[in-house]
């Protein structure tokens, strides 16, 4: 395994492991159960045909838990947009096409997105909500419709890679089952409100904000055109999307905004 990472995210680093494989090493503090969950979800995604990337199981390196995957030779959709800004509409549409492809897969082997969302209400990230508010949010989420489509829950251009033969979706650690509208609502929320990487300058935040708005417009236009999800569906899942975003990631700079959004969603009923 290489000594320097070839990619880095919020929770893990990726290292080359020979020519054909990579090791995704979680940062210290990520427990073995979380990694085991990602192994199971990644293997299921491959089994269902929604990713060609094979998962070769878990490893431990210097006390850090990790996973061995096939190495893919491609670039993320974000890089496509960065190389040619005129391709932003195409990138947004491609993102929708790949999301629809994921949602055509169905399973009874993943947890229900509604129960995962309700479970987040007991995490420290959601502690700003009062007990009465948490109960109200839980009732709202449990009243949402059931489903068995595969949902990704972290679907954005950096998790879709463009290869010569096809596009590939990566990072299945948050995969669940449910209504596709839940997943699309999370992607919409990510484009609208998610924090950019720390250290991004004010001028670049303006640029990235404009890019996000363009990508979101073409992503939603393409996804909604399929007719399986409506804007009203996305709005109904908005409160669950905020709970999932905050509970699963707990990004400090997003806490106040997500809590305020949850309260606004409750008040809008």
Residue ranges and their predicted role:
Residues 4-111, 145:
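ATP-binding pocket architecture of kinase catalytic cores
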Residues 20, 66, 148-150, 167-168, ...:
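Hydrophobic "anchor" residues on beta-strands that sit immediately upstream
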Residues 24, 38, 154, 171, ...:
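Acidic active-site catalytic centers that drive phospho-/nucleotidyl reactions
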Residues 73, 155-157, 174-175, 186:
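Short, glycine/acidic-enriched loop or turn micro-motifs at the edges of active sites
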Residues 104-153, 163-164, 168:
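An alpha-helical support segment within catalytic cores of ATP-dependent transferases
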Residues 158-162:
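Hydrophobic residue at the +6 position relative to the catalytic HRD Asp in the kinase catalytic loop
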Residues 166-212:
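Active-site Asp-x-Gly
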Residues 191, 198-269:
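Helix-rich C-terminal or lid/interface subdomains of diverse kinases
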